Amino acid sequence: DIRPSRGLGDVYKRQAHNFHSTHKHMPPGYLGEDPLAASFNVFRYRAQNVGVLTFLLPFMEQQNMFDRISQEVNLNLDIFGVDNTVVPPAQPWWRGAQSFTMAQNQMGMFMCPSTNIKEGRITGALIGTWGRPNSNSGTMGLAGFGGATGRALGKTNYLGCAGGLGNVNPTNAWARYKGVFGNRTDYNFGAMTDGSSNVFAFGEVTGSLSRKQRTWVHGWLGCGIMPTAWGLPVKRDDQRWYRFGSDHPTQVQFCMGDGSVQKFRTQDGTGSGRWGKYIPISAMQDDNTPSLD
């Protein structure tokens, strides 16, 4: 295991803010298929599928780990699809031997002490969202490894907030609710026009529970984002891989764009409440800033 957790705020405020200071923008939420594509299939594996936490490694004294990944997987935001003609090749991270080895590091700083995600049976290797052009519909997908491989892969309790459904096609109604982190995004603080203190940046995830057994969990190298379209779990048995969630009773912790950590009541993230508060706070440019109280 590498370094114990200092909590959600440390991952975002210290590491992502340092990334922004160096690069003048936030890291991408993940490197997925073309976000403007006319169709979506998470199982096509046509992208690097590297998530936001990987880009933060150099800012948490893990430059060597980042270098070993980037030697095998091209992390250029502008190279879409699989391209073996570039150096390094644009390929899914798990096709690189070094990258696959690095992904098995159990990163203590990405884990919440309140949740035992190491018991998960299947570890997500990539996650992505998509919105159908000229509509109000969309979807998300997760693919991962089970068995001994899934147990060996490093896991995370923290993911970047994609807003309602991520940075979908601008003709999709969900585009209004895009968040700080998305598919190949490079937003800066100025993009948070709702105010950095009013926008979710990172949040807690637990994976899925089925009959009190943790099934799907999220791998830190490939899983980068979580949308808010599917609300929050009201009770522990409602925890799912497609929602933020925590094992803290009745609440989920989020790190806001300014680095402050706020507790959000789970009952405010379901039913009509998600439209009144949860989804608007997850969006950074929807001109709606409801109170966290």
Predicted regions located by residue number:
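Surface-exposed loop/linker segments characteristic of extracytoplasmic
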Residues: 10-293
